[in-house]
Design a protein with these regions (language model features):
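Active-site-proximal alpha-helix that buttresses catalytic centers in soluble enzyme cores
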Residues: 1-98, 109-156
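Short beta-strand segments
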Residues: 104-106
């Protein structure tokens, strides 16, 4: 089996800022993702989120229903700007070599993370739109090559 990494943004945020939480739409998205991801891609072996900060816990809150449903843990040990260490872990850790890995991150940092994951610039947005909560990217790796990237829209 080849390695696959799902990259997605956290769920919707409340209109009133600052607010660390998800909006009601974001909470609904998190619940839907908990069903959609295993059904569409299989059970993930690992879930990574940007560590909660003083400005947001939305990545963790988006993945919590998935982790709960799968009785899995969420790795929140990387800060949002820790692209290189996270990419090194995702691509170099033998324990993750053949797993499906889900990564939920902040939209401003996803393009940089994708670059560290060897994604070609033409295959990923250089700037993630502020209003895009629906996109999901599947990075498929075989034998250490650059990933084949499939862009998807979440069906909800």
């Amino acid at each position: 089996m080849s390695k696959a990494i799902l990259l997605l943004r956290h769920g919707e945020e409340p209109a009133i800022q600052p607010n660390l939480d998800l909006s009601s739409d974001g909470q609904k998205r998190a619940e839907r993702l908990a069903k959609f991801i295993p059904k569409e891609f299989g059970k993930p072996g690992s879930i990574f989120v940007a560590s909660p900060s003083s400005s947001s816990a939305r990545c963790y809150l988006t993945m919590r229903p998935l982790a709960t449903a799968l009785k899995a843990t969420v790795d929140a040990s990387f800060k949002g700007e820790d692209y290189a260490p996270l990419a090194f872990k995702l691509l170099g850790d033998p324990a993750l070599r053949h797993e499906l890995v889900v990564v939920c991150w902040t939209h401003n940092d996803l393009p940089s993370l994708a670059a560290y994951l060897n994604v070609r610039r033409k295959d990923f947005p250089t700037r993630w739109p502020d209003d895009d909560y629906d996109s999901l990217f599947v990075l498929s790796y075989k034998n250490g090559t650059r990933p084949v990237v499939k862009a998807m829209t979440q069906p909800f």
